[in-house]
Swiss-Prot record:
Entry-linked Pfam families: Spin-Ssty
Residues covered by region (Histone H3K4me3 and H3R8me2a binding): 138, 246-248
Family recorded in the similarity comment: Belongs to the SPIN/STSY family.
GO molecular function, one term: methylated histone binding
UniProt-annotated stretches for the region Disordered: 1-23
Region (Tudor-like domain 2): 129-178
Gene (UniProt): SPIN3
Functional note: Exhibits H3K4me3-binding activity.
The name this protein goes by in its record: Spindlin-3
Length: 258
């Protein structure tokens, strides 16, 4: 698992750090916005770039300028300046304000949008979403490690890929899981917690935390703030969070507190 933009040593995202599938966060009222990184002034509305291939430069502080190419997966409705991106050669999904973040330079929208592909097994795809799984990864030394996680959804735009997160690393990843399943590298678990979603009456509205500002207390006593940007349809208690100081998308089963 790799991380762009030099966030981890040697370009690798650690698969050994402890993570939490269920955390307690505090809903907060948003004060005057405080950005760790400066943003460009807003300009005239731009065309829709969801589904487009892009490339741009990236320079954070004194680090050297690097070049990145990827696919824009989504524009976040509760923060339209924020885009979800899958960069070539990297497994995480990233959240960036492409038109505002001053670390992004020379943004170019490449010709031709990403063409949709046919799912090889729609039945398996439907069964897989919302399920606990064991995902097998091969290390550079050739040994295999099993990672328990949850398949969250079929990814937008790149529709043969799936969103997934892991108990020990609660960040949003995406893989071609149907291929992994057929190769024996993905096993769907028979988990007692994977009960069908509760039936809802027609027109019933389920409370959502999407758009809420959150404050997360870390083990060292420090706090970080962010926004809930998405609710997982297959598991309504599970949400995507974009923290102000990070471009990863975090996935938590939220416990609402006052």
């Amino acid at each position: 698992m790799k991380t762009p933009f030099g966030k981890a040593a040697a370009g690798q995202r650690s698969r050994t750090g402890a993570g939490h599938g269920s955390v307690s966060v505090t809903m907060i009222k948003r004060k005057a916005a405080h950005k760790k990184h400066r943003s460009r002034p807003t300009s005239q509305p731009r065309g829709n770039i969801v589904g487009c291939r892009i490339q741009h430069g990236w320079k954070d502080g004194d680090e050297p300028l690097t070049q990145w190419k990827g696919t824009v997966l989504d524009q976040v409705p509760v923060n339209p300046s924020l885009y979800l991106i899958k960069y070539d050669g990297f497994d995480c999904v990233y959240g960036l304000e492409l038109h505002r973040d001053e670390r992004v330079s020379s943004l170019e929208v490449l010709p031709n949008r990403v063409a949709s592909s046919r799912i090889s097994d729609t039945h398996l795809a439907e069964i897989m979403v919302g399920k606990a799984v064991e995902h097998i990864f091969e290390t550079e030394e050739g040994s295999k490690n099993e990672w328990r996680g949850m398949v969250l959804a079929q990814a937008p735009v790149m529709n043969t890929w799936f969103y997934i997160t892991y108990e020990k690393d609660p960040v949003l990843y995406m893989y071609q899981l149907l291929d992994d399943y057929k190769d024996g590298d993905l096993r769907i678990l028979q988990d007692s917690n994977d009960s069908p979603l509760a039936e809802r009456e027609p027109g019933e509205v389920i409370d959502s935390l999407v758009g809420k500002q959150v404050e997360y207390a870390k083990d060292d006593g420090s706090k970080r703030t962010g926004m809930v940007i998405h609710q997982v349809e297959a598991k309504p208690s599970v949400y995507f969070i974009k923290f102000d100081d990070d471009f990863h998308i975090y996935v938590y089963d939220l416990v609402k507190t006052s």
